[in-house]
């Protein structure tokens, strides 16, 4: 945009650095990429996450809680990818900070987007650690991603079942009813 170029030129001149890189968002992708992904995840959490619903359904035991956190994070990422192409690029294009196999496996199930190449090994390990019934249950959760209460309740049940069946060495990190609208332009009943 011409206005952005003009502002950048003014900033370089005022900063006495006329040769400064005016295309920082492209030239420093290694640094800014993970930052963009983190910012997108924070925005998705603010828009689609209800702390009360999460707290009500979060399992008490540590193993189930860790699984629940992975599924919850995958749900938010999938919602972002489903509606916003730029978010998809940021989340899948700059994923290097975590090695959460269950999160990426669930992300694939919930969004229909394949995990990036550097995550495929941890996804394969997570998939191999789950029984066919657990894999089916994970796929079933995909239909609930837009309804936080139902998703959280079903995810908690899935985690309670899975926590005894998922080996510890599988890579992973550890209210009011409302529906998320079917389209990004819709209204969210939580927000009025």
Where do the PLM segments sit?
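Segments forming glycine/polar-rich beta-alpha architectures that bind adenosine-containing cofactors
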Residues: 162-192
């Amino acid at each position: 945009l011409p206005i952005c170029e003009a502002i950048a030129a003014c900033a370089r001149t005022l900063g006495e650095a006329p040769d400064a890189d005016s295309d920082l968002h492209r030239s420093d992708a290694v640094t800014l990429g993970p930052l963009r992904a983190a910012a997108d995840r924070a925005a998705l959490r603010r828009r689609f996450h209800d702390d009360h619903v999460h707290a009500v359904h979060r399992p008490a035991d540590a193993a189930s809680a860790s699984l629940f956190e992975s599924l919850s994070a995958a749900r938010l990422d999938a919602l972002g990818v489903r509606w916003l192409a730029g978010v998809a690029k940021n989340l899948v294009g700059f994923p290097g900070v975590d090695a959460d196999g269950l999160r990426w496996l669930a992300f694939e199930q919930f969004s229909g987007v394949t995990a990036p190449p550097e995550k495929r090994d941890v996804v394969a390990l997570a998939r191999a650690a789950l029984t066919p019934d657990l894999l089916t249950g994970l796929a079933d959760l995909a239909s609930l991603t837009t309804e936080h209460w139902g998703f959280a309740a079903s995810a908690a049940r899935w985690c309670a079942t899975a926590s005894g069946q998922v080996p510890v060495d599988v890579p992973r990190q550890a209210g009011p009813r409302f529906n998320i609208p079917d389209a990004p332009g819709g209204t969210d009943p939580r927000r009025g």
